[in-house]
Regions:
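Conserved PLP-enzyme active-site core in the AAT-like
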Residues: 1-191
Length: 191
């Protein structure tokens, strides 16, 4: 919530919050300047589960990518791309790392979204003057978004993880399935 409501507003990004379980409300919130539909696979703090397939259909109908935060869902429990998500993000600090030792994040691009079709994503579809006039959509095809992220945003913001922290996250992935199985087992007992 804080990222969307407070941090991103400092960069001119505004968010319209809706009830993800009311599909009409989701669709009615889309404005001409909307750039993406964003939701969590398991909502925080209620652990509610939205209809990802239906929301993906709404987003795609309007030429928008569906971005899913799968931090709590983890790749072990749900794979949002199989349900229509275009981009999946994870806070790797939580379940993927599993030990609270490392700050990190993951962006997974499905490669299925057409960045040129809607005309809303000139930074990816049009020639980029800061990168030798390359159109990432033309040059990288299905990998346009992640190529743009790597070539421009990482270059300009320096958002990268150290080799040791990457190692710690990889170690965490080795036990992800065991840890999530235990979480699920414990949850069933509580419920």
């Amino acid at each position: 919530y804080n990222l969307l409501e407070h941090t991103l507003t400092q960069f001119g990004v505004t968010t319209t919050f809706v009830n993800a379980h009311d599909l009409a409300e989701v669709e009615n919130a889309i404005q001409p300047n909307t750039k993406a539909v964003y939701l969590e696979t398991l909502g925080n703090p209620n652990s509610d589960i939205p209809d990802i397939d239906a929301i993906a259909a709404i987003a795609h109908k309007h030429g928008l990518p569906l971005v899913i935060d799968n931090t709590f869902g983890t790749p072990y429990l749900i794979r949002p791309i199989e349900h229509g998500a275009d981009i999946v993000v994870h806070s790797a600090t939580k379940f993927i790392g599993g030990h609270g030792t490392t700050l990190g994040g993951i962006i997974v691009d499905s490669g299925k979204f057409d960045w040129k079709a809607s005309g809303k994503f000139g930074n990816i579809a049009d020639p980029n003057p800061s990168y030798h006039g390359v159109s990432f959509a033309d040059a990288a095809g299905p990998a346009a978004f992640v190529t743009y992220i790597r070539a421009i945003l990482l270059r300009d913001t320096g958002a990268t993880i150290s080799p040791f922290n990457a190692f710690l996250l990889l170690q965490g992935t080795e036990t992800l399935s065991l840890r999530i199985e235990r979480h699920v087992e414990n949850t069933k007992k509580v419920v």
